[in-house]
Amino acid sequence: LKTYRGVPLVKILAGIRRCGKSTILDMLQDDLVKSGIPADHIISMRYTSEDFDDGMTDKDMYNGIKNLMADDGRYYLLLDEVQEIDGWEKAVNSLLENANTDIYVTGSNSKLMSSEISTYLTGRYISIPVYTLSFSEYLEFKKSDSRSPKELLNEYLRLGGFPLVAFGNFD
């Protein structure tokens, strides 16, 4: 993501559920703060939260975010599970055009990649696929595990490369 920081495109992190997209946004937020971005210029929204109404519209989304922007400075928008908002593409496009923003969104593959993206965001986004852990990444998570690489490979093949699985012990 660092490669695309400040690039005037919507960065869309897409992948299957539980593959680590939200964690990547959390890590990005930490990196932004460490690099000197004021915390009040980082707007993080998780649209699966109970804080949002089921019937939230693109206008509600747009106005809610705009109301958090207190000045003309650059704002970093970290929008998690945006596909939960009908018409999110319009809101994000308007924020890209009408505000000083660097926008990152996540969502699940099936709902996120609709035809509306091509309508509202053509040429204005980059899709960044997020996958489950590779075996070498899985080994990195398990480096304190005393089992042999072969045993860990069997576990990886049996349970998959989801980060939550890599943190657990499923013997």
Regions found by a protein language model. Name each.
Residues L1-D171:
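Phosphate-binding site recognition
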